[in-house]
UniProtKB/Swiss-Prot annotation:
InterPro entries: Exonuclease_RNaseT/DNA_pol3 (IPR013520), Oligoribonuclease (IPR022894), RNaseH-like_sf (IPR012337), RNaseH_sf (IPR036397). The gene is orn. 3'-to-5' exoribonuclease specific for small oligoribonucleotides. This is Oligoribonuclease. Keywords: Cytoplasm, Exonuclease, Hydrolase, Nuclease. The active site is at Y129. It comes from Tropheryma whipplei (strain TW08/27) (Whipple's bacillus). Belongs to the oligoribonuclease family. GO terms for cellular component: cytoplasm. It is found in: Cytoplasm.
Amino acid sequence: MCVAPTPSHLVWVDCEMTGLNPERDELLEVAVIVTDKDLLPLDEGVNVVVSPSSEALGAMDNYVARMHRVSGLLDELSNGVPVSEAQAMVKEYITKHIKTGGIMSGNSIATDRLFITRYMPDVHAILHYRMIDVSSIKELAVRWAPEIYSGAPNKKGGHRAMADVLESIAELAYYREHFLTGTA
């Protein structure tokens, strides 16, 4: 069986949402950075605050509303752009580096992918079906190498998309150096 090679660049994504259900919750913020295979960012990335519907904002539970209030994100929503404009900005950024087949990467990335699929289908269409989920590597380290897990960088992003993307890249770099060191 011949399998086409995947691009070496990684598309790091983090989304902040009104909740975790893409059928009723909406995007509030999306950040993307493309890195090379060595996890070096190609540039500063793109960060977009999205203007959600009043219904989605009103339906946020207290925990999520408090989280976004503390992070300062709620205060920025009045300057947010429609999701269609956010999608165009994110797609333009990604395709500047990768035309198609980018490997979506991040922490607990499956949830982000559900929201990208629902609200940014043009972005989803240019991503590969494979993903790199740093949280899966973290879970392996917890079980197989707790001493390495205990040295992992602490997260401080405070539920802001760009800070979370940068922390995910740093976390994978740590695990690559300390955990994924086997030789063939």
